[in-house]
Swiss-Prot record:
Protein name: Replication-associated protein
Source taxon at top rank: Viruses
Cofactor note text: Divalent metal cations, possibly Mg(2+) or Mn(2+).
EC number(s) given by UniProt: 2.7.7.-, 3.1.21.-
Residues binding ATP, per UniProt: G221, P222, S223, R224, T225, G226, K227, T228
Cofactor: Mg(2+); Mn(2+)
Domain CRESS-DNA virus Rep endonuclease span(s) in chain numbering: 8-116
Amino acid sequence: MPLPKRFRLNAKNYFLTYPQCSISKEERLAQLQNLSTPVNKKYIKICKESHEDGQPHLHVLIQFEGKYQCTNNRFFDLVSSTRSAHFHPNIQGAKSSSDVKTYIDKDGDTVEWGEFQIDGRSARGGQQSANDTYAKALNSASAEEALQIIKEEQPQHFFLQFHNIVSNANRIFQTPPEPWVPPFQQASFNNVPAIMTQWVSDNVCDAAARPMRPLSLVVEGPSRTGKTLWARSLGPHNYICGHMDLSPKIYSNNAWYNVIDDIPPHYVKHFKEFMGAQRDWQSNCKYGKPIQIKGGIPTIFLCNPGPQSSYKDYLSEEKNRSLNDWVQKNAIYVTIEEAIFTTGSQTSP
């Protein structure tokens, strides 16, 4: 009579199934983490699945740094800490850790430890279908989730086309800029020149009430007079400061107006498009892809007095005479000398 075959499994990825296992996911994870093996564990994922009979089943994926040879079919047994009970799993080698991870993810009640080790194999005989992968990525909730799906199921694409994949994911899942919340109420700005208040009334509004060609506003004044906080408190806007960035992460075509702050006039790309509230124009700012700007909204230009900063000084140069004539028809220029809010109040800007 032949001797019973000894248990032996030599694999890098283990797929365990525990029927009728009532131990919590966290306790199971702790017990599996504490198992002593000659090969380091890299990743553990546990899923609790409730069958029709109401009994919880447990699926586990364990990934090792290299192949681990298991000769004890009781090695992965779990022990209840509240009663005298052992839970013995069915033990298999996972031909495709990606497929196993997808399978045990289906119920969503999971816990994991470590970093998943990607492979390019599929139990269906070959690589994952690219269409299946990208359909799953498109149906995911965020760019990060989509990229993780592609990384796990299409590692070759992810490695060789990383730049394009990341760029496409960010475009597909792009979110509008977070609306800015003013730290002070509009009433705090109680020293605003009447011409600026009237400009707001005439030009800053939603698309339905906005003039066909609104006027822009240039405000020049010393630092710490409240220019920026006032300009940003008027409604939904695009705020551009430091350099011209019209990427979708910064610029929204649904804004009511733009604020261009502390950018020297000779560095303002699309000067006329912004100041003239022009419509439907294109931008290809440095290092960015060409984008379509809806336009038709006014712009507030904020600057300090002095060389290289003042729009007034820039436009008064002889070489800019014709540009200055154009600006007079498309913008209102205001110079302030003092704070546009009342000082001394704790709620003042």
